[in-house]
Amino acid sequence: MYTYMEYLQKCFFKTTNWNEDNIFSNINATSQAILDFPIPNGLKVDSSSKTTDYLASSFTLSNFHLINGSLAYLYSLCPLTNTMGTKDVSLQDAIAGFRIIEPMITLRNQPVGPKTKKLRYSNKYNNNNNNNKNINNKKYAMKKDSRNSLLYGRMYFPGSALEAMVIKRINENTQLLVKCVSNPHLERNGTMIVYLQNNTMKYLRELIYSTNESLIGLRFLYNLGNPITKNISPALAPKFDNSVVSVGTELWFAARTMSPGLSTALRYSTRSTSTGKPLTMTLAVNPILGHISSTYTVKTSVASTFCSKYDFNFFSYASNLSLGFELYSYARNKNYLSPVESSMMLEQPTATVPGSLHNQATKPRRESQRQKSEDYISSSDSDYTRMQVKEFGPGGRITSEQKSNDRLPNKVSPIQNKRDRGREHFTNSSSNNSNSNINSNANTNLDAAFEEKVTTAFQNLVNASDFSSVVKVSTSLRDKTVKLLWEGRVKDFLVSTGARIAINPVTNAPEFSKFGINFSYAF
């Protein structure tokens, strides 16, 4: 579960159109959220508040062997109006989980040709083509907003440990990230890491410097294929693409010890055209250490995800297999939206990346935020989304009584029937046309349109689902450990509790090696 400050940082990235999934360090974020999730230690209480749209504070108190705590502040130059407290926040936004990777279409305002830039300005800002003054004001506002900053600081007690973070947006595709830690127990009483990141739809370039060991690093991530928004406005881009392939590498050199480092990774993310279910596969290789790691993550249904990871070292021939899953529970006794409102909600795209404010439209009080969404979806999906509302229950949401029926394979038959009816209708209407090439192209376009509807509908169902809790389980065959984690909403609190069970090497009996519970409240 994210801390409130981490949640606000993600809101800042979402507000400023910064794509976290395009960062090389997040290439295994999905598998890590399901397999390597942290277990709480002891008792911890976190109380946070956002006094204004620009300023927030957080107080944390924990009891593990001794009582300690921390006090944190966060300030943003841009208003964080898309944030919520623990009472109203979507569980999918507050918890790290499966993420649909879309690095090719989530970023906006990319540095492309002047014709595209002119079209972008005219589509997004020019409501009156004859009002040149408004155009100039909007251009100036966009240029000013592209240089937003975020300041964060935390003080720990008892003791004198401090940590700070500064995010400075240089332009719309480049930012400077500085992290500092001051602790008397560290060498030279602290360390500092500086990141200079250039993030575009096509590639990522990152320069890193750490005062620890005078470490210098370079990271690159390249997305194969042509960007969808290369020659068209982002508002007119297709909502989904079936697959994304990303290849990245990182180079490290410790100047103090003269030690090099090298690793490379590949990520493949796609969606089933028949069910709309997404999956992600990754492969990471470290040739210096001889380590290979591969992961496979698939969202088996709207409320469940399965993940597996296999590690192998070709120097020592050591291997390990890790398995894990997450299972969401649906909220009960909720006031569902009307079918008409739900149909409108399913037609309205909520986000491009799940886990980053993508479920803001699940409650009536989030209506104003949903109205601000600038994403685009074709109005031709209205018939299909109304069919989904009828198919999946009242309000277009999946209720707790439909847990056993929330998988899409049994729901695809109406899609196939509609596809067949559409194909038959098209064939009858075009039977008098002597040009067979036109018929073939039209059938291809029809299939592509229905495939896009399937993937869009599945994502909308995930976004519209109102979850109350999630259970995560992971195990490792080599370590012989089982990790259990429950996260959910209790009244106005977000609660996270879990345990790690391991085999005692002496008695060969299972025992709790770690246990804790966290309470978080924010308003």
Swiss-Prot record:
Residues covered by region (Disordered): 352-440
GO biological process, one term: mitochondrion-endoplasmic reticulum membrane tethering
GO cellular component: ERMES complex; SAM complex
Annotated Basic and acidic residues bias: 364-375, 417-426
InterPro entries hit by this protein: Mdm10
PANTHER family membership: MITOCHONDRIAL DISTRIBUTION AND MORPHOLOGY PROTEIN 10
Free-text note regarding domains: Lacks alpha-helical transmembrane segments, suggesting that it resides in the membrane via beta-sheet conformations similar to those predicted for other outer membrane proteins and porin.
Family as reported in the entry's similarity comment: Belongs to the MDM10 family.
Function: Component of the ERMES/MDM complex, which serves as a molecular tether to connect the endoplasmic reticulum and mitochondria. Components of this complex are involved in the control of mitochondrial shape and protein biogenesis and may function in phospholipid exchange. MDM10 is involved in the late assembly steps of the general translocase of the mitochondrial outer membrane (TOM complex). Functions in the TOM40-specific route of the assembly of outer membrane beta-barrel proteins, including the association of TOM40 with the receptor TOM22 and small TOM proteins.
Protein name: Mitochondrial distribution and morphology protein 10
Species of provenance: Lodderomyces elongisporus (strain ATCC 11503 / CBS 2605 / JCM 1781 / NBRC 1676 / NRRL YB-4239)
Gene this chain is encoded by: MDM10
